[in-house]
Amino acid sequence: MNTKRIPGFQWAMMIFIFFIVAYALPIILKDLQSSVPFKDFVFDMSTLAPFIAAFICIAIFSHRGTQLASLKLTISLKVIERAILALILPLIIFIIAMVCFNIFSDSFVLLQTKDLSVSISSIIIGQIVMAFLVELGFRSYLQHIVETKMNTFFASIIVGFMYAIWNVNIAFSFDFAIYSFLYSFAFSMIIGELIRATKGRTIYIATLFHFAMSFGLVFLFNEELGEVFAMKVIALSTAAVAILYILISLIIRTILYFFTKRNLDEVEENNYLDHVNDTDEDLTDVGDEYNVSETDETHHSANVNAATAETSSEVQDKEDPTDRHHESNASDQDNQYNSTEDTAHEDDSRANIISENTPSPSSNDSTKVDAKHSDSRANSAVEASTEKAHPESDQDEVKVNSRYTSNRQSSVVSDARTTIDEESDESSRHLSSESDDVTQQDNQPLDTADSSNADYERSPFDLKSKRGHRS
């Protein structure tokens, strides 16, 4: 059976249109027969109808490659074998018909055709052309289209009925029409079996068989004159040979299939025996595929689980050192912060102890120690008291100290320099500074408290600077 499928609706329309055109055209072509200088048995115009119908279907329908697949003109060994058989079968049919004609009739006379006034070569050429046109339409095109949906045997039956309806001669009696129909159907069945498994090389075989049968009927029998007995003998002989040939062919193919274990695809393509065990094989294949798919899914799931476990372990391993690192950094930061706070509190306590244990400022050494360890605010208070005693000589120093007091961002170096200058001035004017020391002792506790708070608010850099000046 042909594997190339045509859509069902298009398939039905192709067969229907072919048959309608092939059946209706002879009505028109018969009127043109008188314009052709040939007799009917030399060239019949109605034989153009199947060729025209096939051409129309190929032109209007799609899948042209599939439609033309059975119109191959190449030759193979099987084609030669079937061509020889196509010449032998008509000979067998005619032998049987002539024997029956002699048995059931008074006599059989060769060349019973009347009015045979044309050359033999003209008859041969005309019969070959007519056979080619008819078989190109019915066998090379129509039967191939039907075989795309069914087996060759059943396709031959359908095409045989259509060909018999198209070729039946109803110009004479009813009995003659019945035998004519039987002859055409058996004729088509033989051709269908001959072209089986030829892979599209059908035209040679069908044309040879058609030509041999038509040529023998022209010369050997007078059925064209309406003789019912002649038509009956020809029809029965053809039907008997068709049945015998199909049965023998079926038996041979069955033997080759069951006993030689050969694949029928090598014997012939469209054998219905090919599809006997298709269901069981399909079920087996589906079961195997299902089992394979389940096994693959199981392996895949196992691999996925293993990969997930490995990934989770790696992530955990990476997270543990990271957490430890963050914890260590946090602990280091806490320790550093605590040490900074301890250092700040220690400096504050030292400042308080120094301020509490400071002796009376009667000597220059005690004044120097107080000047080194006092804050900027204590220095400003000393400068203010000094300014009152010496407003004119120390005006520049007072401006510097006032600028330092307002901004609170002067460097420790400038404070030390100012303190040294103050000490030199105080040593020269000791008497005048004694009176001011009393005031300084009164304000010193307040200034020391403010200095401790300021030291607590300043950055570690300022604390380190203070530590440097305590040497």
UniProtKB/Swiss-Prot annotation:
Originating organism: Staphylococcus saprophyticus subsp. saprophyticus (strain ATCC 15305 / DSM 20229 / NCIMB 8711 / NCTC 7292 / S-41)
Leader peptide range in chain numbering: none
GO terms of molecular function: endopeptidase activity
Similarity comment: Belongs to the LyrA family.
GO biological process: CAAX-box protein maturation
UniProt keyword Cell membrane, yes or no: yes
Predominant location category: membrane
Protein name: Lysostaphin resistance protein A
Span list, region Disordered: 294-471
Top-rank taxon: Bacteria
Matches recorded under InterPro entries: Rce1/LyrA-like_dom
Protein topology in the membrane: Multi-pass membrane protein
Compartments, record wording: Cell membrane; Secreted, Cell wall; Cell septum
UniProt keyword Transmembrane helix, yes or no: yes
Entry GO terms, CC: plasma membrane
Residue spans crossing the bilayer: 9-29, 41-61, 84-104, 118-138, 152-172, 175-195, 202-222, 239-259
Protein's gene: lyrA
Pfam families (alphabetical): Rce1-like (PF02517)
This protein's UniProt keywords: Cell membrane, Cell wall, Membrane, Secreted, Transmembrane, Transmembrane helix
